[in-house]
Amino acid sequence: MRIFAACVWICSGVLCGLFSLSAFGEGTPVPVHGLWLWKSAEVLERPRGADSLRDFCKAEGINEVYVSISAQSEEQEEGRLAHLIGLLHHSNIRVEALLSSADADEPGKHRGKLLEHVRGIVQFNQKHPAERFDGIHLDVEPQQRPENKGPGNLKFLPGLVDAFLAVRAVAAASHLTVSADIQIKLLKGDLNQRRMLLTSLPRLTLMLYELSSPGNGENAEQMTEKLRTASGKFLDMAYQGLDGRNLAKMVIALRTPDYGELLPQMLKTLDDANRTNLHYAGWARHSYNDYLKAAQ
């Protein structure tokens, strides 16, 4: 019942949040090219912090940024956040509030804390209608808790889906899209478990990590082929046996430690290999903080 009740919100989320609009034709979808920004308050305190982020996004083809938000940063950094959003919007880059939790799959105080955080983003948008967040990006990771570890252990999934739907309910009134990060482990569920997950939100981001490492002796060609094969495999695994219009689109995320300087090339590989897959929505890069660290 909770899944069907959420369907009334899908249209606006799909239209506004799945893709950006191409300059080559009105309504033509182009893949998402996302970027995580952690410790946003620290980054934005730097001289030209917001401008440097904007310049990086333009140079690397990033069209949306997931900006980490804590209750403290929401209150103390409101002006800097509004400035950043305005700057990125001026360059046609979407901005989503990145909210994290390891426990929000559990009803009660943990989920309540996450929902209060979402309400804070809604209030921010009401105060800053010209510099509003475009969406909520969830990083809810119950699999990090000891009781949820182990192959095939997905007992937390119903609670995770409930958390996703609860966030959508709060975000819908402010026309905020909602997306979430997921791990490969969730794609190994049975048909009903995958249906539950893939009908909970319009878009999910698969964290496709640890396929390769700069120190494992693989050359760029080998890394590329491994990524091409794995990305197709996991897209097939996610949607096997499922059909219907209300299934989430999938963004695939890669991280800097796995590829180093080859990361931009690997991200391009994802688009080249999967652009004809109707379930593929683009890629996301983890993270801007890694870039800043490497540049020091």
Name what the model sees in each region.
Residues 32, 43-45, 85-86, 96-131:
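Active-site-adjacent "subsite" loops/lids of carbohydrate-active enzymes
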Residues 67, 71-100, 151-177:
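Aromatic-lined substrate-binding rim segments of carbohydrate-active enzymes
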Residues 96-101, 161-191, 247-259:
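Aromatic-lined carbohydrate-recognition surfaces of secreted/lumenal glycan-active proteins
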Residues 247-296:
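Substrate-binding cleft of secreted/luminal carbohydrate-active enzymes
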Residues 209-256:
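Glycoside hydrolase catalytic-domain groove-lining segments
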Residues 49-72, 131:
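Catalytic domains of carbohydrate-active enzymes, especially glycoside hydrolases
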Residues 26-53, 57:
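Boundary/entry segment of secreted carbohydrate-active catalytic domains
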Residues 121-155:
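Active-site groove signature of glycoside hydrolases
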